[in-house]
A protein has these predicted regions:
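Acidic/glycine-rich beta-solenoid
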Residues: 1-138
Length: 138
């Protein structure tokens, strides 16, 4: 591994880059790069990553986080695209999470519900599948 890191003024990681060379055909490994952004309160708001491997293998992801004025996580969305990694072709996958919290006194930081929507497509969007689950907490 040949990782290089960059940091902001409060030591949050801004990027990680693996400068390894792309391996020969049929070999594992490859180059990776990740970037991170933070808001004025140093909370993670987004991340991106890329991977390049042998035999035209590529992958990338994006992550987005949302917060409310009480600093609670309200949303998380991650999207992944990969080509020729698990099979010859393209895979798109991701999820959207929405968090809600209690409203009664003493329960404003208690997680009340997580709604998640998961999806994936292989080759064409017509093969996508949406799953919607509501997880409730007492």
């Amino acid at each position: 591994m040949d990782n290089a890191y960059t940091y902001d003024a409060v030591s949050n990681v801004l990027s990680v880059v693996n400068g390894a060379s792309v391996p020969q055909s049929g070999k594992a490994g490859g180059q990776m790069a990740h970037t991170y952004t933070y808001d004025a309160l140093y909370r993670l708001v987004s991340a991106t990553g890329t991977y390049t491997g042998a035999d035209n293998k590529t992958a990338n992801y994006t992550l987005a986080m949302g917060y409310d004025n009480m600093h609670r996580i309200t949303s998380k969305r991650q999207i992944l695209t990969q080509n020729n990694v698990q099979f010859n072709g393209t895979l798109n996958a991701g999820y959207d999470l929405t968090y809600t919290y209690g409203t009664d006194a003493g329960k404003r930081f208690q997680l009340a519900n997580v709604k998640d929507v998961n999806y994936h497509t292989e080759e064409t969007p017509s093969e996508s599948e949406n799953v919607n689950n509501n997880h409730a907490y007492e």
